[in-house]
């Protein structure tokens, strides 16, 4: 059985997230998704996610391609990958915490050598990113309750 792992913030789900996860699932039999912790997102992006981590995890796990969604580690971002021992890791188009080669080198230290695949497709549709959704909400409802 081929285990695939994908990770992300998944703050305000949109079609791009779904296409990313559908692609990831197509590469194997089991898809486990690591959802970034609120504190991790705040450290990387300089702001907390809009949707709390447990709600984001539950929403991701409810998606058809996803077999299981877990929260990432607060200590070591590689910890869940080390525990899961995936055959394939799928990176999203905007994931830059690691590049493919750096990730391979880091995982080699733990005797892991999964195939690393980058999903480079941006979905061309209205509201294809969380940022675009937030901008539209502010435009439509900015200052209004």
From Swiss-Prot:
Listed GO biological process terms = FAD biosynthetic process; FMN metabolic process
Could you tell me the keywords of this UniProt record?
ATP-binding, FAD, Flavoprotein, FMN, Nucleotide-binding, Nucleotidyltransferase, Transferase
Q: For binding ATP, which residues are annotated in this chain's numbering? A: 9-10, 14-17, 94, 122
**What metabolic or biological pathway is this protein involved in?**
Cofactor biosynthesis; FAD biosynthesis; FAD from FMN: step 1/1
The answer to whether keyword Nucleotide-binding applies is yes
Looking at the Swiss-Prot or TrEMBL record, what is one Pfam family this protein matches?
Answer: CTP_transf_like
Enzyme Commission designation: 2.7.7.2
**Source organism superkingdom:** Archaea
Q: Which reaction does it catalyse?
A: FMN + ATP + H(+) = FAD + diphosphate
Main EC class of this protein?
A: transferase
Cofactor names from the entry are: a divalent metal cation
**Cross-referenced SUPFAM superfamilies:** Nucleotidylyl transferase (SSF52374)
Q: Which GO terms describe its molecular function?
A: ATP binding; FMN adenylyltransferase activity
Q: Tell whether Transferase is among the UniProt keywords.
A: yes
Enumerate the InterPro entries for this protein.
Archaeal_FAD_synthase, Cyt_trans-like, FAD_synth_RibL, Rossmann-like_a/b/a_fold
Give the function comment from the record.
Answer: Catalyzes the transfer of the AMP portion of ATP to flavin mononucleotide (FMN) to produce flavin adenine dinucleotide (FAD) coenzyme.
Tell me its family.
Belongs to the archaeal FAD synthase family.
Q: Please give the subunit comment from the record.
A: Homodimer.
Protein name in the entry: FAD synthase
Which gene specifies this protein's sequence? Answer: ribL
């Amino acid at each position: 059985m081929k285990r695939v792992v994908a990770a992300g913030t998944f703050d305000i789900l949109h079609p791009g997230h779904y296409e990313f996860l559908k692609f990831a699932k197509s590469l194997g039999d089991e898809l486990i998704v690591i959802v970034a912790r609120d504190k991790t997102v705040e450290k990387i992006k300089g702001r907390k996610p809009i949707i709390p981590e447990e709600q984001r995890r539950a929403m991701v796990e409810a998606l058809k391609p996803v077999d299981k969604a877990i929260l990432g580690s607060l200590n070591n971002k590689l910890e869940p990958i080390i525990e899961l021992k995936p055959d394939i890791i799928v990176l999203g188009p905007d994931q830059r915490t690691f590049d493919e080669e750096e990730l391979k080198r880091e995982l080699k230290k733990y005797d892991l050598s999964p195939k690393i695949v980058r999903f480079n497709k941006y979905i061309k549709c209205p509201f294809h990113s969380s940022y675009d959704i937030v901008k539209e909400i502010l435009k439509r409802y900015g200052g209004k309750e």
